[in-house]
Amino acid sequence: MRQPGRRPALDFDDLIYGIHAVEEALLAGERLRSIAIAADRTKDAALRILLAQAKERNVPVRFEQRAFFDRVPFKAHQGVIATAPPFPYASLSDVLARPRRDGSPRMLVVLDHLTDPHNVGAIVRTAEAAGADGLVLPERRSAGINAMVRKAAAGAAAYLPIVRVANIAGTIRALKKAGIWVVGADASPAGIELGKADLNRPLALVVGSEGSGLAPLVKRECDFLVRIPMLGRVASCLLYTSRCV
């Protein structure tokens, strides 16, 4: 039932939209505040699991007219929008303290100031699928985990520990002190061909920004570089790395 009274303003960064993203957030145990579903989807079989999970977790569900969904800037919402608390970032120390389930070498992904939420979301999705222990991104000049990133990640942001740090170069130094080899993904000839790199070790893969790639200081901090021609090949690198470790 819709509660009477004035409708609160929406904080778009704290929304999760799309059937799959909301469903995965529920399955992962995220404490969603409420879920809005388009009134014309009340009998949609595709929502059966989502509604059952919401009921089990006591998440309020309300059915809204399409005018409600017109208020948000996201067009791919599929008539499903959840309101969530601010994204629960992990700490780097917690991520490093967690044992690998299968005993294989640790694997992290570090993003050096990527600003496109669709690229960040795609890397979150691939990193989670490849079995990464976590993903690190900077607090400034970078896309954080917002509604668009969650949608592009197709639910993976609910499962992959994600850390925000003040300084990427400093974080790389901390990772190396923790015994992790830091590998920069780079398009320059200076990099080792991906298939020839020894990646069977505790590893952090650093991915540079869409326009300028790895920052010079970040590149210098890396133990070595692997040659990747373009950002779209990051998925291949992550999947290759997961097979190596």
For every predicted segment, state its role.
Residues 1-98:
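N-terminal positively charged helical leader segments and presequences
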Residues 240-245:
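Conserved small/polar residues in nucleotide/adenosyl-binding loops
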Residues 65, 85, 112, 138-139, ...:
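Short beta->alpha connector loops at strand-helix junctions that form conserved
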Residues 183-235:
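Active-site/ligand-binding-proximal alpha/beta "capping" segment
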Residues 57, 153, 221-222:
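Short, structured coil segments at secondary-structure junctions
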Residues 27-30, 46-47, 52, 100-192:
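RNA substrate-binding interface of SAM-dependent RNA methyltransferases
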Residues 95-100, 195-198:
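Short amphipathic alpha-helix with an adjacent loop that forms part of the alpha/beta core around
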